[in-house]
């Protein structure tokens, strides 16, 4: 029988997940290496909460809640004492469309509510229509602003930001 668990990640689980991402990156591997170091440090400093969906001891989906403006680009209006910024929505392709991420998302929202958060925000690239459709389904209907973000290697992307009250 399949056993699926939603949880806040441990540092060991984060190391395993990031090593997997680095080893499977087909391009911009340097970004993944930087993100691993940054995210583990941010978790240890209480700036983020990483959430994992684990099926039969395998991490199959994830999302991270950023809790501090120091770790969010264009942070104004996106993160504060009562607003968490959600990032890194990922599900391994063979598990997509099977409800696993939906369960993780519900777990994360309940956990953030229990921690006193009243709103969550996200960023999405304008051309990511599939992701935007999913986010709208999850209730991210409040357009906050548009801006640009930068990857560690200098890549610049356009981003639309949306919010959802909890």
Which role fits each region the language model picked out?
Residues 1-16, 20, 166:
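Conserved N-terminal entry element of GNAT/NAT acetyltransferase domains
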Residues 11, 24-88, 92-93, 105:
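Acetyl-CoA-dependent GNAT
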Residues 48, 156-161:
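Short hydrophobic/aromatic beta-strand or adjacent loop that forms the aromatic wall/cage
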Residues 95, 99-107:
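Conserved acetyl-CoA pyrophosphate-binding loop and the N-cap/start of the following alpha-helix
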Residues 102, 127-144:
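Conserved active-site alpha-helix within GNAT-family acetyltransferase domains
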Residues 112-124:
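Conserved GNAT acetyl-CoA-binding A-motif
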Residues 122-132, 149-153:
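Conserved beta-strand-loop-alpha-helix junction that forms the acyl-donor binding cleft
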């Amino acid at each position: 029988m399949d056993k699926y668990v939603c949880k806040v990640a441990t540092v060991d689980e984060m190391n395993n997940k990031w090593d997997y991402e680095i080893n499977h990156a087909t391009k911009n591997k340097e970004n993944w290496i930087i993100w691993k170091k940054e995210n583990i440090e941010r978790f240890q400093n209480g700036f983020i909460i990483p959430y994992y969906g684990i099926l039969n001891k395998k991490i199959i989906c994830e999302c991270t809640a950023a809790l501090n403006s120091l770790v969010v680009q264009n942070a104004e209006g996106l993160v504060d004492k009562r607003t968490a910024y959600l990032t890194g929505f990922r599900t391994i392709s063979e598990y997509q469309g099977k409800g696993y991420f939906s369960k993780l998302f519900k777990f994360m929202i309940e956990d953030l509510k229990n921690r006193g958060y009243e709103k969550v925000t996200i960023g999405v690239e304008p051309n990511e229509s599939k992701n935007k459709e999913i986010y709208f389904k999850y209730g991210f209907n409040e357009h906050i602003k548009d801006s640009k973000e930068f990857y560690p290697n200098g890549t610049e992307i356009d981003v639309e930001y949306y919010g959802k009250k909890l």
